Amino acid sequence: MAPFEPLASGILLLLWLIAPSRACTCVPPHPQTAFCNSDLVIRAKFVGTPEVNQTTLYQRYEIKMTKMYKGFQALGDAADIRFVYTPAMESVCGYFHRSHNRSEEFLIAGKLQDGLLHITTCSFVAPWNSLSLAQRRGFTKTYTVGCEECTVFPCLSIPCKLQSGTHCLWTDQLLQGSEKGFQSRHLACLPREPGLCTWQSLRTRIA
């Protein structure tokens, strides 16, 4: 593998020239879905400038992990994550970190590939301070309770109906025009009884 090098303006121009015209699009997930579908969920600071591998056209960001919420077994003996990897082009869902505040903490939910943390534009990456207190509680404690049995089911157009008793209908985008509505910021889809999951309130108190 070719070494990673600082992302220079010439490389940016090359990537722009060879990138397909169609941009990456995806539907942002409910935070619980992001947690359950990710291999690794951490809190970290972006502390370095992006570096690009000119052979694979992947870039990496240096991070400083401050907390891990999911992935202890998947990570194995590795005690720390120092880099996060993403495609170097936005057209293929590459994530571009736009904050220059190196002391700001971010919630990062991603996939592990060969022991390396990978994210895309479609991954859940958000400033920790932008999360509601309920969402913080979900990531630190509660979302995991619903991962095995429950599914957040997006409702994007009418009519939509539940396909299973273990599904919770997510209507934020339909009713409020945003994935950051009430259900996203304050609720989790959790087991009520065997074979049944319902939206349940997340207390604002952090455990």
From Swiss-Prot:
UniProt cross-references to SMART domains, sorted A to Z: NTR (SM00206)
Residue span of region Involved in metalloproteinase-binding: 24-27, 90-91
Pfam families documented for this protein: TIMP
Post-translational events: The activity of TIMP1 is dependent on the presence of disulfide bonds.
Gene3D superfamilies: 2.40.50.120, Tissue inhibitor of metalloproteinase-1. Chain B, domain 1 (3.90.370.10)
Swiss-Prot/TrEMBL keywords: Disulfide bond, Glycoprotein, Growth factor, Metal-binding, Metalloenzyme inhibitor, Metalloprotease inhibitor, Phosphoprotein, Protease inhibitor, Secreted, Signal, Zinc
CDD domains associated with the record: NTR_TIMP
Signal peptide boundaries: 1-23
Subcellular location per the Swiss-Prot or TrEMBL entry: Secreted
Residues with site note (Involved in metalloproteinase-binding): N37
InterPro entries membership: Netrin_domain, TIMP, TIMP-like_OB-fold, TIMP_C, TIMP_CS
Keyword Transcription regulation: no
Annotated S-S bridges: C24-C93, C26-C122, C36-C147, C150-C197, C155-C160, C168-C189
Sites bearing Phosphoserine, chain numbering: S178
Presence of the UniProt keyword Signal in the record: yes
GO biological process: cellular response to UV-A; negative regulation of catalytic activity; negative regulation of endopeptidase activity; negative regulation of membrane protein ectodomain proteolysis; positive regulation of cell population proliferation; regulation of integrin-mediated signaling pathway; response to cytokine; response to hormone
GO MF term list: cytokine activity; growth factor activity; metal ion binding; metalloendopeptidase inhibitor activity; protease binding
PANTHER family: METALLOPROTEASE INHIBITOR, METALLOPROTEINASE INHIBITOR 1
Purpose: Metalloproteinase inhibitor that functions by forming one to one complexes with target metalloproteinases, such as collagenases, and irreversibly inactivates them by binding to their catalytic zinc cofactor. Acts on MMP1, MMP2, MMP3, MMP7, MMP8, MMP9, MMP10, MMP11, MMP12, MMP13 and MMP16. Does not act on MMP14. Also functions as a growth factor that regulates cell differentiation, migration and cell death and activates cellular signaling cascades via CD63 and ITGB1. Plays a role in integrin signaling.
Assembly description: Interacts with MMP1, MMP3, MMP10 and MMP13, but has only very low affinity for MMP14. Interacts with CD63; identified in a complex with CD63 and ITGB1.
Family from the record: Belongs to the protease inhibitor I35 (TIMP) family.
Name of the molecule in the record: Metalloproteinase inhibitor 1
Organism whose genome encodes this protein: Papio cynocephalus
